[in-house]
Amino acid sequence: MKIRLLLALAGSALGFAVLILAGLPTASRAAEAPATASAGEMVPGFNHQGLERLHEGLRAFVDSGQYAGTVSLLLREGQVADAYAYGMRDLENKLPMGRDTICRLYSLSKIVSTVAALTLVEQGKLDLGDPVENYLPQLANRQVMVGGTADAPKLQPASHPFTLRELMTHTAGFIYGGSPAAISEVWERAHLWDSKSLSEFVDRLAPLPLVHDPGTTFEYSVSIDVLGAVVEKVSGQPFEQVLRERIFEPLGMKDTGFSVEPAKRDRLAKTYKPGADGRLVEAAPLIGVVPEGTGAWPGAGLFSTIDDFARFAQMLCDNGTANGHRILSRKTVDLMMANQLYELPLKYNTFRPNNQADGFGLGGEVRIEAGGDRLGSVGDYGWYSAATGFCKVNRKEKLVALCFTEHFTGKAQPLDWHFVRVFANLYNQALE
């Protein structure tokens, strides 16, 4: 599929309309921006009324003052079916959100990093069943914290060395935070995010206990950052160079990386959260994800535009190929999008509480049941951003759905699951 033809920019033959919104009250500052919307009815497979409902739903989040801005993109059979940008990327300077707005991907970076590792698997340089200690010996002889306190932890040896597959499925036993207080305190003392490199990160991680025995429990974690360190070690290249050579350059992703060039920083979106009075205030980036770049964090550090990320997502939808380049084989994409948690009890089988419709593949969530709390299809694959970003690839429907908002909830869980559910329901109900 010729991606350069699929992702024509606003103002191209798709005939984008620009709606200038004036006279809005101060409380709706974000909605003063122009909205751009594509002619969705030109692409088969969507109904125009459904797309209008999608736009109305996105506008409601901005007009109510909950969000500064949103940008969404739907691809069907490799064509842009709908693109909609509304509100601001920068409230203070009244700069509008658009398809060329650069956003922090946060955990959407994990899918990209997983693909990079899988290219090495295909070359025979890695195997999913390999113990990670084969490549990072400082992570050998893991201990699991089963009780005690941060100062006097009760430990027992892990039953087996965790594997690359367990890294990709967040079942290696690592954490991010929010786990039992004692082990979270132990981890916080390591100041992992002060590391200046992935090798330093692994060295800081090495003495920390696991929270679960490997392979027994899904626990969202730093696993993909460890995976990135493996990729660096095996490839002999800096992680960002691996991504650039194996993914970004073949796909034409010119606005994606772990930093933002000075000449492009005027396109960078600010991230917002509700302030004490409920009005939006600028939020500090998580783990030092700043445009100057503080390191290549495989699990959360990438910047990108929605068009750039659509090139990546469309590659997955097209079974690993794009622009005449094969990034992954079809069967590897099949494996990536298959539920890998089938051996675990159901309560350990999902990322979101009380959600039994989704399992987890390699690097991302996969829909395994038609039920659940939102519309979708069995086989949907994708992930989310802490800044309430959304990516789903549906190969059966030949559909890619993306939305970036750069919004934190201001709570311990920065991702707004309510928005995720609303967006998923609205774009799915627009399908014919």
Regions from the language model: what does each represent?
Residues 33-42:
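Acidic/histidine-rich, surface-exposed loop or edge segments in extracytoplasmic proteins
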Residues 90, 142-378:
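Short, surface-exposed loop or secondary-structure junction motifs
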Residues 10-23:
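Bacterial N-terminal signal peptides
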